[in-house]
């Protein structure tokens, strides 16, 4: 089944991404996953056994949960993610003050801060 990505939120404290997806049959879900790829709004995705096809390219994705879309939960996810990449307009540098658990920044932001005496 083909899905359209409505919105995506990244959680730097957990490394988990959340995407609101919408089917042609008017079903809205929230996908909780970990991946090295960002699913931008407007992307067309098709689930497969070992990942997801995003705009006709296969990417590995670990899906943790799929739930019915809940607007109250979605608002809470957006307000509490604290990832500067989730904001508009986006800056060039990451201002997240703690260690980011996202392995590859999907927004291409650079980290120029010290955390626990380690450059991140």
UniProtKB/Swiss-Prot annotation:
Cell compartments where the protein resides:
Cytoplasm
| Key words, A-Z | Cytoplasm, Stress response
Give a yes or no for keyword Cytoplasm in this entry: yes
Q: Cellular component GO terms, alphabetically? A: cytoplasm
Biological processes, Gene Ontology terms? cellular response to starvation
InterPro entries, per the entry: Anti-adapter_IraM, PmrD_sf
Q: Does the keyword Membrane apply?
A: no
Known role: Involved in the stabilization of the sigma stress factor RpoS.
* Matching NCBIfam families: PRK09919.1
Say which family it is in: Belongs to the IraM/RssC family.
Q: What is this protein called?
A: Anti-adapter protein IraM
User: What is the species of this protein?
Assistant: Salmonella typhimurium (strain LT2 / SGSC1412 / ATCC 700720)
Native organism taxonomy? Bacteria, Pseudomonadati, Pseudomonadota, Gammaproteobacteria, Enterobacterales
Name of encoding gene: iraM
């Amino acid at each position: 089944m083909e899905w359209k990505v409505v919105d995506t939120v990244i959680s730097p404290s957990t490394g988990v991404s959340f995407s609101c997806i919408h089917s042609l049959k008017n079903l809205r879900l929230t996908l909780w996953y970990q991946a090295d790829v960002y699913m931008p709004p407007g992307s067309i995705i098709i689930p497969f056994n070992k990942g997801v096809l995003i705009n006709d390219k296969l990417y590995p994705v670990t899906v943790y949960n799929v739930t019915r879309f809940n607007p109250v939960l979605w608002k809470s996810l957006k307000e509490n993610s604290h990832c500067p990449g989730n904001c508009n307009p986006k800056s060039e540098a990451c201002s997240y003050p703690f260690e980011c658990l996202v392995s590859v920044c999907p927004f291409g932001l650079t980290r120029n801060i010290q955390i626990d005496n380690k450059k991140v």
